[in-house]
Amino acid sequence: MIEYTTRYDVKKTMYEKFADSAAQHTNEPCFYYYNNTITWAQAEKMVDLCAAGMLANGVRKGDRVIICAPNMPQCIAAIYAVNKIGAIASMLHPLSVASEAQYAVDLVGAKFAFCFDVSEKAFKGMNHLTLVRCKTAEYFPKTPYGFIANQLYKKKIKGKTAPATDVKKNIDWKELLREGKEYIAAGNEIPIAENPLAVAAIMMTGGTTGNPKGVQLCNEAINNLSYQLCDVVENVLDMKCDPKSDAMLTALPVFHGFGFALCMHVSICTGMPQSLFPQFDAKMCSDAIKKYGINYIFGVPDFFEKVYKAGYLKGIDMSNMKLIGSGGDVVPYSLTEKMDRLLKENGAHCHFVSGYGLTECVTVCSFTDPRREAPQGCIGVPCYNVEAMTVKPGTTDEVKGEDGELCIYAPTLMEGYYHDPDETAKVLVKHNDGKVWLHTGDMCYIEQETGDIYYRQRLKRVYKISGYLVYPSFIEEAYRAMAEIYDCCVIGVGEEGQTKLKLFVVKNKKFKNDDEEMLKKKIIEFGMQNLSKWSVPKIIEFIDALPRTKIGKVDFKVLK
């Protein structure tokens, strides 16, 4: 682990940071969830019983546990319970389809998983798996508001849920907690893991190719990333992180490093309450910002575009706003300008920030300066304890004053891709200075005088749709299962930040004369049934053959 300077104690596990805050803020709010307030004491009880319940079901230190749920109290509690006993939280998109869930389970060798109402069916038939079902409405308030919210939610998910049959064991959240309570009552000890350098989480990402990889992140790396935000607040804005007056909007999904470390774990480390949203809703998020005085707000560009367009934040007091910004996708400069105007009109003393990062370094490694307007195209300066350089692509040769592949050296770097040393070696590269640098696969330009980094283009064949990573190889593999399709290729088209997927299809000879409009509909329907909605192509074009390079690879440049 890289040595670095910070006044915060990052040499602890994630659970130990949770326990520290719970001890200091016992009866204060920890989560806001659909107008329900869950205190630190209540959250700690959930974590402790969940940890005991897992032990009762055979989960042990070092085991990988799948967490396939959105931002809800059970999901957050499960993450820290897994960490408490030294197991590893393997985060999975809550709307993953069966093939994606099977891939993730097989990749990490998981035997225990958490899911929610809608994702349960994806685990059907995994007969070695113990599955814990978490109901989205479990912690809705016991009030008329909560009753109505529950009824509306039931209506919303009607027809979208199905039980996961043929698993080893299928229990609900409350039953797991009951088993945990019995385990403790029987006199069993609950061992607490204490190694800050142990892997805490595995995040799914594209790595350097279109195939999902499991990024291993240790406790200390995650802690360091979270405290970087506090360093920005204290050393740049000359303010303090104050749990008495601060609050975080946790609308960014925690299955991604951005929501996991910059929203969820920042709140845990600082003791500030966080407002949880399992699904983004512009109106509900805006109402929570007003109600709870939320002054740490992060979201993908689409979030802010919708909130701004609807006018939900217009005219509210933002004089206590500390940090507000976007990442997870390209941030249009027009959005930055609009949000800066809104912040100024509402009395904020900070500017809208843009961030850049990769799961391979937990998430954000650069921020624009919240004290000034960001130059167009700028993705910020390196965060505290982060070094950046550009190199000639495919080499370790530094280039200055010109575009090059961005490389990062920081205490937030991953341990490597899970069980994939070859791919790890491609991105974690030792340079002549003796340091191991992360090669990002992104072309950037670094302004030498200011340190500002300017994003140019992405080298990796991975696309972001509404902030979510989609993997072309997965999509192509799925569509090749259709009898009508001989071969296919996916590319991204459109402006940065508004990427759409286009599928090129080579038809099987048997179906060469079929009506193409009917076949397009069939392809879309197949995608809706077998892929996540972000992976379904918006544009379909039929061609006679895929263009190839001289060595036989598909020529993506020709297709583009």
In which residue ranges do the predicted regions lie?
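Conserved pre-ATP/AMP-binding loop-to-beta segment of ANL
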Residues: 27, 156-204, 211, 236-247
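Conserved AMP-binding/adenylate-forming
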Residues: 36-38, 50-96, 251, 469, ...
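Conserved AMP-binding A3 loop
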Residues: 39-41, 191, 200-227
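AMP-binding/adenylate-forming catalytic core of the ANL superfamily
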Residues: 96, 113, 297, 410, ...
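Conserved AMP-binding/adenylation subdomain of ANL enzymes
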Residues: 223-247, 255-296, 310-311
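Gly/Ser/Thr-rich phosphate-binding loop
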Residues: 295-299, 308-375, 387
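Conserved ATP/PPi-binding loop(s) of AMP-dependent carboxylate-activating enzymes
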Residues: 381-385, 394-429, 468-470
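AMP-binding/adenylate-forming catalytic domain of the ANL superfamily
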Residues: 529-553
